[in-house]
A protein has these predicted regions:
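Metal-dependent nuclease catalytic regions and adjoining charged, substrate-binding loops involved
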Residues: 43-53, 61, 72, 76-80, ...
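Residue-level recognition of conserved beta-strand positions in structured domain cores
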Residues: 7, 128-131, 162
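Short amphipathic alpha-helical segments and their helix-coil junctions
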Residues: 1-13, 54-60, 125-126, 191-202
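Short, charged/polar micro-motifs that form catalytic or ligand-binding hotspots
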Residues: 11-19, 134-140, 207
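Non-catalytic protein-protein interaction segments used by genome-maintenance enzymes to assemble
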Residues: 100-152
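Nuclease catalytic cores
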Residues: 1-37, 219
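Hydrophobic (often cysteine-bearing) scaffold residues that line and stabilize catalytic clefts
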Residues: 17, 21, 68, 72, ...
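A non-catalytic, helix-rich entry segment at domain boundaries
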Residues: 28-103
Length: 230
């Protein structure tokens, strides 16, 4: 249903607090890896934090924050510091062209795919930067985005470089080797979803999904499977 509201009805959800914090850390990470691709070191911690906080402050007044601006800003500072000291230190970009790589391709079934890879490392690993508010179990073998990128680029190793805003902030690099079984499973999902979209059949999220809720879905109030169904 999110696809229907976003791309058929063209109702674009506004940037929220969590998205802003993620965007801010992501921008700093991109800047850091661009510098690191040329000097092998990257940005200093202070410069990394300043870039993330600057991005946050630039957009904060346009966003309906879930906490005060000062608290949101402090969170960005804390998480960007953690990201820089872990992923920023340990991950090495393949080249300057391996940051924010635009991909255009398909899964071999005439379903076009356009996307952006945050980072491709020197040891051929596709990395997606994530900022999360909760520590959730992640199964990358079922990640449609990253498995699709793996298929298009012929790079088998995928990863999520995440920082999690828990009481004690955590940094994790979750790595997975993509198998033919994963590619086949994701291809089948894409085939089913694209076929349904062409037939204008828009299904709800799986029952019990955390993202199908008032807290996490912008379309909750207008979705027939959201508030009106309760």
């Amino acid at each position: 249903m999110k696809y229907y509201f976003r791309y058929v009805e063209e109702i674009k959800p506004p940037l929220n607090g969590a998205m802003l914090r993620g965007l801010s850390v992501d921008k700093a990470a991109n800047g850091h890896f661009l510098v690191k691709a040329s000097n092998k070191v990257g940005m200093k911690t202070k410069d990394f934090i300043d870039l993330a906080v600057g991005q946050h402050d630039e957009l904060a007044d346009e966003v309906q924050l879930d906490v005060s601006k000062a608290e949101s800003r402090d969170t960005v500072s804390r998480l960007s510091d953690l990201y820089h000291k872990t992923h920023g230190k340990n991950l090495v970009p393949k080249s300057e062209e391996s940051i924010q790589v635009k991909l255009i391709g398909d899964m071999g079934m005439q379903v076009p795919v356009i996307g952006f890879v945050d980072l491709i490392t020197e040891d051929d690993m596709i990395v997606d930067t994530k900022v999360r508010s909760q520590n959730r179990a992640i199964d990358l073998s079922r990640d449609i985005q990253l498995v699709t990128y793996s298929k298009i680029t012929n790079i088998n190793k995928i990863a999520i470089a995440q920082v999690v805003d828990t009481k004690e902030p955590k940094s994790d690099l979750i790595v997975h080797e993509v198998s033919e079984l994963s590619i086949s499973s994701v291809s089948q999902k894409i085939r089913s979803v694209s076929g349904a979209i062409r037939k204008r059949v828009f299904l709800p999220a799986p029952e019990g999904s955390w993202y199908c809720s008032k807290k996490w879905c912008f379309y909750w109030k207008i979705c027939p499977y959201g508030e009106s169904s309760k």
